[in-house]
Amino acid sequence: MPKMKTNSGAKKRFALTGSGKIKRKHAFKSHILTKKTKKQKRNLTHTGLVASVDVSNVKQMLCMK
């Protein structure tokens, strides 16, 4: 059976934490920022975690399953 290929888009977008959770960046922070408030832009800067319902799909894309 051939090796699984890692999804190249996913490996650029997700990172693993030490405890095994998956980090992600927030969307809506690249352009059209003039109509967003300072607070919105500041909160979008922080990293988030992948939701529990999506973890299995992301792990499959990263060939961790």
Curated annotation (Swiss-Prot):
Superkingdom: Bacteria
Gene Ontology biological process terms from the UniProt entry: translation
Assigned keywords, A-Z: Ribonucleoprotein, Ribosomal protein
Sample GO molecular function, one term: structural constituent of ribosome
Protein's name according to its UniProt entry: Large ribosomal subunit protein bL35
Family, as annotated: Belongs to the bacterial ribosomal protein bL35 family.
Extent of the signal sequence: none
GO cellular component terms attached to this protein's record: cytosolic large ribosomal subunit
SUPFAM superfamilies named in the record: L35p-like
Taxonomic lineage of the native organism: Bacteria, Pseudomonadati, Bacteroidota, Bacteroidia, Bacteroidales
